[in-house]
Structures are given as structure tokens and as C-alpha cells.
Amino acid sequence: MPEGYTHVRTAQRAAHAIHYKLQCPAAFAAGANGPDSFFCYEVWKKGQNRTYNLPLLGNRMHEDKTGAFLLALLHHTHTQAQIEYTLGFLCHYAADTVMHPYVVFVSSPGQPYGMKGGHGYFEIALDSTLHAEDTGVSEVPADDSSPVPVGQDLAEIAALLHQCILEVYGQDISVEALADSFYYTYRLRRLFTSRHGVRRAFYWVLELFFGGRGFITGHVSPAHLKLNLPEDWTDPATGEERHGGAFALLKDAQHRCELFMTAALGHWMGKLDEEILEKTLGSMSYITGTETEQSKSQQAPDAEQAGETA
């Protein structure tokens, strides 16, 4: 999964390409972070001690009933903030399904980021490189990677998520916790900048006792992208030989974002029927970029899942 700025940047470029003028940019950026926003919720606690285990839910949303959740968002969206959050979320899905197989490959043994924690080191280095290209500064501030919707916009997004998560995954998460997840993400990413290397050195020691190598430093900017990234690679999920490295894939990700947003807007305007919408979006695993039995599942949550809150 790319880091926050890569997701937001790709989504914004896609919106510009289809001539969609954002009215709620923070809502759109929050959507572009997708389920990743849940990973930071009460991150200092162990799973069983969190008010809700949103990091576990975030992992599940990347693999389980992915198409069903996207359709739920599309069906229950009503306000402008909800519309733009949903469009951003579609872009997160689009970018992950294009980029993530390459991330897995490039961080596998023998590849440039094959070291422990390499997955995160590659993603934050790509974030830093793109931010430097856009702004001249490789340090990625939280305002650029994960701005927080406020007021009524935040309330409407949290209500949308509550309804869709309950419907698709059977988990009754409070709107307060869902709203808090955006603040936790923002606050944590504010700590993950280290212009002069002091914080990075502290985190380098800290993560030896908390999470392991790369758990924290794999999210710290600025970071330098290695120059020997492969252009030819093997898809880890399918075994297919692929051509086109990180920057070619970013263009592909943007095009997929454009396709999915155009489909959503067409559906809301009554110009694209449900069957074509479903076929366009698919129901892919965010991890493999392919459809799996788990990602395609449309089954209602069982009783145990429906009662799960933490």
C-alpha cells in the first residue's frame, strides 16, 4: 500500500484529469487514505485493550468483501462530504490494486528493499520523492498526507462509515471512534517527520523494543528512494512477468482512479446501471490486485462477527 501522500496526490491528479472540482478537499483526502486511517487508532495499545480494534478491521477491509463495501459507500452516500470521501476511497482502492503487487515484489528478498521493514521504507521513500517533486521539500507534513475533515463534514463521513461497516462487516463501531481515527492518523504522522534526523535516531532505537525494525522508521520522512528499482518484475500473486516500474505504475494507478470515479459519478447521475458499475469496480484484494474468494464474498456477517466490537 503506498503511503498517504502518494495516495492523496494520485487521487487529486485523477480528479483534475476528469475535470472534477473538489469542494471538500479534506474529505477527499481522508477517503484517499482508505482503510489505512484505521491503523493508527489507539496504536499504543494492544488489540484487545483498544476501545475498538480498528487496525484489525482495517486489515480485513483490504482483503474481505472489498467490492461489497465500495458498493455500500456508493449506495449510502448523500452529502457533498460523503460524495468526495467515497470518491477518494475509490481512488485508494484503485491505487492499491495497481501498486501493491510491485511493493511486495520490490521488498522481497534479493530486491532493493528486501531488508526487514523494507515495505515501509520503500513506501515512505516514494512519498518523499513525490513530495519533493511537487513542493521542493522531501519532508512530508501531515497536512499534505492526511488532513482531517472538520465539523459537519467529519460527522457525515463517520456516519457513512458506521452504516457501511455495520452492513458489510457486522461491526457496530461508534461514530466517535471512526471520527477519532482521522485525528490519530494526523497526529501520528505529524510525529513522523525528521528533517534533521533527531527523531529518526530516537525511533531507530525505540522500534527495537516496540514493533521491530521498520515499524516506526518505515514511516519517517524525508527518505531517499533507491535508484536501482526494477522495471521488469514478477507479480507475486499471479506469477506474471510484468514490465514497468514504480513511476509507470503510478500513471496506471491514476488512470484507474479516473475510471472508478467516472463510473461512480455516472451511477449517481443515473447514467450507469448497477451491473456495469459492479463489473467496472470489481472486488479485488487491495493486497494482490486480484479477485479472491475472500474479496468477492457477498455473504452477510455471521452472528459472531456481528457482535464483535473490539
Name every feature range the model reports, one short phrase each.
Residues 1-86, 93-310:
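N-terminal leader/auxiliary helical segments
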